């Protein structure tokens, strides 16, 4: 009985993990922000589910729609950060991030939007309102 339960649990975990998509971080992580810069960071692991990918896609789209001029000038940015990548560890440590997170940072002050961001991951309008 124990072996059957273990086998079923292992199979379920395998199915759950196979739904995640491997994706490399292609964005460079900037060092510290100046007084006028605002950055939205989406911290994630290498393996991500559909909701995780939706948070990134809709957050990035919202930032680009809300602040097009600021994005062009570099005073407002969206950065996807893979926290499994050791090169990003110092940024995650500096901001106190240990897992998946959606945060807005200005002058080393951060607003954590993780809970609401994941709750509204598939609702672009609500996520856009959060990032306003």
Describe the function of each predicted region.
Residues 64-74:
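Signal peptide-proximal N-terminal region
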Residues 34-65:
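Local sequence-structure signature of Cys/Sec-based thiol-disulfide redox active-site neighborhoods
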Residues 92-106:
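Structural micro-motif
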Residues 1-4:
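Positively charged n-region of N-terminal signal peptides that target proteins for export
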Residues 72-86:
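Thiol-based oxidoreductase modules, predominantly thioredoxin-like and allied folds used
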């Amino acid at each position: 009985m124990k072996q059957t339960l273990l086998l079923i649990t292992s199979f379920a975990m395998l199915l759950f993990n196979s739904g995640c998509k491997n994706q490399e971080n292609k964005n460079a992580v900037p060092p510290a922000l100046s007084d006028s810069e605002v950055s939205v960071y989406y911290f994630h692991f290498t393996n991500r589910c559909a909701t995780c990918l939706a948070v990134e896609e809709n957050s990035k789209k919202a930032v680009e729609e809300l602040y097009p001029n600021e994005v062009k000038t570099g005073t407002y940015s969206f950065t996807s950060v893979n926290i499994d990548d050791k090169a990003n560890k110092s940024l995650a440590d500096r901001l106190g991030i240990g897992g998946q997170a959606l945060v807005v940072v200005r002058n080393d002050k951060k607003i954590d939007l993780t809970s609401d961001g994941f709750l509204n991951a598939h609702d672009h309008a609500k996520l856009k309102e959060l990032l306003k």
